[in-house]
């Protein structure tokens, strides 16, 4: 697929930054490209610790929320948590439950069933809690859009607290965007208007932790015990794909470090079941190995199983549960592969191929993997993609977007066709009647205003850098940039006029490109590209330009530099 190459052009005195912080000028440029301008921001990025995290008291309603909770705890009232079935909801629920238990609360929790309940708090779950004698409901990773549901709970005389991080819902009134929030007793969400909290990109678990931190302060609990929540916040922050900037970066760095010494039996058992070494866990392992196992419970079974794993104190029980989670994830992978292929074929062989916004209906597909498949479709065609499946009542869909297309806003414009919707600029969830799927698809495509430039993937190059400049010392410095993820992507470099000396497709599945390239100054380097997927390979003797990331390769005791090809084109 053709892509646009763009070089960041942000200006700064890179030499001075390098001298002040003891880093290479290339590092200084990368950091500036991540939007950091002041010395304070750069220091937080490179050296931030838990002491640099923002005060939870800055969150609107956070103190009010804890005042309500402590009053309920002292009065012996029942508190009920309603979470979510994804990794963020799982970790958020675990944090709230452990924290409230530590404060002496009579607390229980429920996670909505993805198939039966759908996303978030609903009347069925409210009735269930009410009939069990619940006085107070507290949500996590959901609730900000549950206006009617929370009104229903209030009419039953219940106290309701919302902790959430999702975008604030809105209506268009006379062309103006009007935000609306539920009439809860307290709402803790950094995205709220008039919330003075300086960072609005926390995940749900991050918001839940802020509440528990204040609760520990107010109840006089041992603050060192808060450390046991570190890895849960890190897992949720990585798994929910929020920006790894500001304090999210601290959360992940500290959480990964603490993971090596975690006392959480369930996490240890899951790491063991995934055949990983606990002292070598990176953000990659969380995002692509451990996280999917936790998520698989909410997709194919009940997310309660994952929470019970994270709460157990029995190692034998933990190992049993961890193996069950891994087995579920294998099943989830098989389903995903099958229906992703069907979705791609449907786009390629029908009128959908001409749409700018892809809406694919897979009636027989398990609704829990719709989001993953939407991501695959987006990756294949570079179009905003929504995969819709048949549900218990009508249809449900999950969408994944591209930069330049705010999926939540665009879906909101079609709100009259939907029964329920919510999400972010880059992802959304919907429910609608099956009969309205085609009308919804047409409305999205009629409303869209994406240019060809938006519909062409862009590769952003941090620094045009000759391969001759790269050495192991520089690559070692790049470790200071970790953890990588959304908002802090792995740095990308580019070089030109590289002569292809060798070029071959290797690997068991013949999907890896291995090249030997010669620079203009005669330096020979090894370059490799994974997941070829039928792409063209460069011809020997021709000159290419290459977008790359340099890595250290260790094999049979030999340490060498290997260039990972992100993209290439003939000169």
Model regions: which residues?
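Catalytic domains of riboflavin
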Residues: 1-4, 480-482
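Hydrophobic helix-and-loop "lid/oligomerization" segment in the mid-to-C-terminal part
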Residues: 2, 6-136, 156-157, 174-177, ...
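A short acidic, often aromatic-flanked loop/helix-cap motif at beta-alpha or helix-coil junctions
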Residues: 12-14, 116, 193-196, 468-470, ...
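Mid-to-C-terminal polyanion-binding domains and interfaces
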Residues: 71-75, 317-323, 327-361, 413-571
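Active-site cavity-forming subdomains of large catalytic enzyme subunits
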Residues: 127-205, 209-218, 228, 245
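A short acidic, amphipathic alpha-helical/loop segment
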Residues: 148-152, 358, 373, 477
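Short, well-ordered strand-loop elements centered on a beta-strand within folded domains, enriched
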Residues: 178-179, 184-187, 393-401, 524-527, ...
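Short alpha-helical basic/polar micro-motif
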Residues: 206, 371, 375, 546
């Amino acid at each position: 697929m053709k892509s646009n190459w763009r070089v960041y052009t942000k200006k700064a005195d890179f030499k001075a930054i390098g001298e002040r912080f003891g880093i290479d000028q290339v590092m200084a440029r990368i950091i500036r490209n991540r939007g950091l301008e002041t010395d304070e921001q750069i220091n937080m990025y490179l050296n931030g610790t838990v002491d640099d995290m923002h005060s939870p008291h800055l969150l609107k309603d956070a103190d009010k929320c804890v005042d309500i909770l402590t009053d309920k705890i002292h009065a012996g009232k029942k508190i009920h948590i309603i979470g979510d079935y994804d990794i963020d909801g799982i970790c958020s629920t675990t944090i709230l439950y452990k924290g409230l238990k530590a404060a002496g609360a009579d607390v229980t929790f429920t996670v909505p069933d993805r198939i039966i309940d759908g996303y978030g708090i609903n009347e069925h779950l409210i009735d269930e809690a009410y009939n069990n004698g619940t006085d107070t409901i507290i949500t996590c990773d959901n609730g900000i859009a549950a206006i009617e549901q929370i009104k229903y709970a209030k009419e039953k005389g219940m106290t309701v607290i919302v902790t959430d991080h999702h975008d604030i819902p809105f209506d268009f009134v006379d062309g103006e965007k009007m935000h609306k929030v539920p009439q809860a007793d307290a709402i803790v969400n950094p995205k709220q208007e008039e919330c003075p909290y300086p960072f609005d990109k926390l995940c749900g678990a991050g918001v839940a932790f802020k509440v528990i931190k204040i609760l520990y302060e107010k109840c006089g609990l041992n603050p060192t015990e808060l450390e046991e929540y570190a890895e849960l916040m890190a897992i949720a922050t990585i798994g929910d794909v929020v920006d790894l900037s500001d304090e999210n970066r601290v959360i992940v760095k500290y959480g990964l470090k603490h993971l090596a010494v975690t006392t959480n039996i369930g996490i240890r058992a899951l790491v063991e079941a995934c055949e990983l070494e606990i002292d070598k866990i990176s953000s990659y392992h969380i995002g692509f190995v451990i996280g999917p196992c936790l998520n698989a419970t909410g997709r194919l079974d009940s997310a309660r199983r994952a929470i019970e794993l994270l709460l157990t104190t029995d190692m034998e029980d933990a190992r049993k549960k961890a193996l069950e989670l891994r087995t579920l994830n294998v099943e989830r992978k098989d389903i995903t592969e099958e229906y992703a292929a069907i979705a791609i074929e449907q786009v390629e062989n029908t009128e959908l191929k001409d749409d700018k916004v892809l809406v694919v209906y897979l009636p027989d597909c398990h609704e829990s993997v719709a989001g993953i498949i939407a991501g695959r479709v987006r990756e294949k065609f570079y179009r905003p993609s929504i995969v819709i499946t048949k549900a218990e009542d009508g249809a449900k869909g999950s969408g994944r977007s591209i930069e330049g297309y705010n999926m939540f806003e665009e879906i909101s414009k079609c709100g009259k066709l939907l029964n329920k919707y919510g999400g972010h600029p880059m992802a959304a969830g919907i429910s609608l009647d099956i009969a309205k799927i085609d009308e919804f698809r047409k409305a999205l495509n009629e409303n869209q205003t994406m240019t060809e430039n938006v519909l062409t993937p862009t590769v952003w190059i941090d620094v045009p850098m000759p391969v001759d400049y790269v050495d192991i010392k520089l690559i070692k410095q790049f470790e200071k940039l970790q953890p990588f993820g959304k908002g802090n992507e792995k740095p990308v470099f580019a070089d030109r006029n590289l002569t292809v000396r060798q070029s071959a497709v290797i690997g068991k599945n013949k999907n890896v490109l291995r090249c030997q390239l010669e620079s203009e100054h005669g330096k020979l380097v090894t370059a490799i590209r994974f997941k070829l997927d039928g792409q063209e390979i460069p011809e020997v003797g021709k000159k290419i330009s290459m977008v790359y990331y340099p890595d250290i390769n260790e094999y049979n005791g030999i340490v060498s530099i290997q260039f990972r090809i992100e993209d290439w084109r003939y000169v």
